[in-house]
Each structure stands twice: as structure tokens, then as C-alpha cells.
Amino acid sequence: TEKYESVKESMDSYLETWKRWNMEFIEAFHLIESSLYESSEERRISLLEKSLSVILDETYEKMLHYAQNLKSPITMLHMLGIIMPILGLVILPLVVSFMCQVKWFHLAALYNIALPIIVYYLGKNILSSRPTGYGDTDISEENPELKKYRNMIIPVGNFEIKINPMIISAMVMIVLLIIGFSPMLIHMMDTTGNWDIVVDKDDSKGIHISSVMDDPDAKYSLLGYRKSQGCPPGEDGAVGVGDIVGPFGLGAALLSLMIIAGIGVGLGIYFRLKSSNIIKIRDKAKELEKEFAASLFQLGNRLGDGLPAEIAFAKVAEVMENNVTGDFFRTVSNNITRMGMSVEQAIFDKKYGAMVYYPSTLIESSMKVLIESSKKGPLIAAKAVISVSRYIKEIHRVDERLKDLMSDTISSMKSQIKFLTPAIAGIVIGITSMITGILGQLGTQLRVLTEGQGQEGLGAAAPMISMFGEGIPTFYFQLIVGLYVVQLIYILTVITNGIENGSDSLGEKYSLGANLINSTVTYIIVSMIIMLIFNIISGSIMSQLKLGGV
């Protein structure tokens, strides 16, 4: 572009942009520049090795401090995002029951808007302080040939049917959402407004269809709609008297779990199908990266013996037989011998090159070094390849040390995502369902008692009636908590992946797919079991409790 007078001036200007983010990169680059002006070969190699150790050691030191400083923010995130909100969920149903001005949408604004924003902000602050380093990339973004693997591929003979993951995800989501919202749909289609399926307190009647709204003889109900007593409850002129509210039924609460399944599992399926094929290809390349240092060392030795690169690849392929590295070198060798390609074409050809099957920036960079250095002769290429081999080993060593530093934090966050958060939230939903059911049945029995005896006949018990508002239906409460669990799983997965792998969009999508499906299913199973157990216990107690003979 002729903006700068020399390459050095252009490079210095470029390095200025890194000053704020990565000083060790600038220092290492200056050492490489200095090596170009050294007359002594020994001194030149020493400077190059120094540049490598500077960037690796400084990165490790930064990550060490990051890991040490991570404990406090993660604890704060855990308390503000998980412990305190879930403890609050135990109290909030009681607040709603005794403060009729508080509605379910107030809780939704707190749990599904305010808290996720706070947790996301805290998480982004944690990630923003992470030192830059080696990170994985989405290989489908760099290689257009791999974009087809973002779809679900079904082989049919010689053809492949590609299905967009969004279609499958949308189908699953729509079916589960219809099932989840069925209590509201049934109520909307019911012209009388009184239809319900109930389990009677009298065991001899069992399950039957009821035409009485808020049937006092029902132990459990499917819908459980009732007429509002207004706010404040039981007082003349109260707001909302006679409005139909609900659904309060156990059946509706259980069916509402399908809404969360639709959102959580639907999103999980989308992320899983979009990334699973590509992650398999990348994992294969990662396996090659693990063995690549040893194979490069062997390749360097063959080149050092004076063998041309074409023959050296075949020799290494024979030695590294029956593993991924051997397959890579064999692919290169076959392209050279059978297709008459040059070494560069055999590796980088867009259609048949070895890099098509093993997409990796690390391997690609190593092979480019080999190609450029081999132009200056086998001995120069041998030294270059052996140096790259040592560099890869050093990167692997530092990477393993970093994983060891972060292991406690990462394992703690993964356990929260996979089990603790959905399980605790599921238990809270079960307890809430029981509390709401007991308060609702007590309110119903007191109202029936009032209608039979009047306010005067109740005496001192009369003020108790106004204590019991409608409360919040478990149907809505479960939606709020379930959606919060899905949001929390999403945010924590993004944070965990960012801490562990840095900027890795492909790994993030794959982790989101696995965690959203597994954690949502865990939440649904725990919620369903606890809800049934606690409601069976409370139903048995309330069926034996008769206020004033009611």
C-alpha cells in the first residue's frame, strides 16, 4: 500500500496495536528481528530460542495469576447467580401468596431478565481478564468445503441428504411447546370454563371429569382454574373479584415441564447437530497434533540425512503406521507418487491435499515452514522442522500445566452446570408446588366454610380468610424457574468454555448442545419426581383435614 517506507516501520506500527493486549508477543518479535542482524549462528539460534521461551513463559505466568485471581469472581458468580436466587425461590411463593399485588410477571422480570443480565455481565468481566493464548477455531469458517458438515447428513446410496439443524430443532420445540401449553389451550376451547379432570378425595370415585370449578372434593386436578377472590382477598370492592385465574392443577404443573423441555432440548439439539460433525473432524486433527511433534522430529532427521522431502514423507509414513500421523504422511506420499503432485500440492491442494482431511492451523503452519525451508535445501529444512517440533512440544507442555492450574475451577463449574443447578432448582419447584397446593386447598376450604356459616359463624378464624391470596400457579412459577435454569446453563457454559479454551466458537456450540440437553432433562426429571412425591404427601394430609366438617 506504500504507507510505510520500510518493512521494519510497517512491522513496528503493527506491533503497536498489540501493546495493550500482549507485550510478550512484541518482545518475542523484537528478539526474532534482532536475530536477523546477528553474524554468529550460535547467537542467532540463542535469540530465536529466547523469543520462544519469552512468549511461552510469560503466557504461563499470566495464566497462573489469572487462575489464582479467578476464585473470588467465580465464588461471587456462584452466590449471585445460583445460591441466592434459588434460596429466594423458596420464599417467593409465600410472598406471592400473602401479597396479592405481586404477580408472576414481576418474578419473571427479576429471574428471566435482571438476574441473567447480571450473571452474564459478571461472566464477561471474568473472560475479559483472561490472558490471550493459543485457542481453537471453527474450522468450517476457514474451509468452505467443510460448511456442509454444519447440517445433519443422511447418506442415501451415492447421495447425501442435508437437513438444516434448525428444522429438526423447530419441530421438536413446537411439539413440546404445544404439549406444555395444552392446559391453557384446553381452557380457551372450553365454552363452560368449568371442565376439568380430577382425582377425588374419596378413593371410591377415583379419576373423573368434573364440571365444578375449583372442586373442593378434588385431591388433584389437571387444570385447576378458579375464580379470583380479588386483591385484597375477601374484601368488598377488591380488584379482580370473579376473574378466572390459574391453572393451579398438578397436571398443568407437570405438563408445563414440556415447555422448558421444548426450549432447552430444542436449542440443545440445534447446537449439537450444527457442531457434532465438524467437532469429529477437528478431534481427528487434534489427535494428529498430539503425535505431530514426534513425527516432525523423525521427518527432520530424514531430511537431515539428505533425503528429499518426497521420499522423507514415505519413510515417516512407514514408521508411523497404524496411527493418525501415519495416515497423514501416507496421504501426502500417495498424492506425490500416484497423482504426480509436488509436496506443496500434496499437502495444500483444495480438493485432494492432506490438509482437507486434517484441518489444523498448527499443522498448516508447520507444513508451510517445511515448504519454504525446503527451497533452501534439505539441511535447512531439517533444522527448521526440528525447531518446529520442539516448539510444539513446549506448547503442549505449557498447555497441560495451564489445564492443571484451572482444573479445580473448571470441574466446579461443570458440576454446577451438569447436576447441581438443575437438581436444586427441581427440588425447589417440588417444594413450591406442595406449598402452593396446601395454601390453595386451605383457602378453598375456608371459603366453603364461610359460605356455609358466614363471617360471624367463624369468629376469630374469619381474619384467616384474607390471609390466603391466589398465590402464583406452579405452572407459571415452574416456567420462570425452568427458563432461568436454561439461561443459567447457557451463560455458565459460555463462561466455562471461555476460561478453559479461550475463544473457541465451535467448542462452545458443542458444549452448549451437550449441556442444554443433559441439564434440561435432569431438571425435568428431578422436578417431576419431587413434585409428584410432595403433592402425594400433601394431598394425603389435606384429604384427611376437614375444617368445620368441610
Listing of model-derived features with the role each one plays in the protein:
Residues 1-39, 300-376:
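Intracellular, membrane-proximal regulatory regions of polytopic membrane proteins
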Residues 290, 294, 361, 365, ...:
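Short, well-structured alpha-helical interface segments that form or flank functional binding sites
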Residues 379-395:
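Long, well-ordered mid-to-C-terminal structural blocks that present hydrophobic/aromatic surfaces
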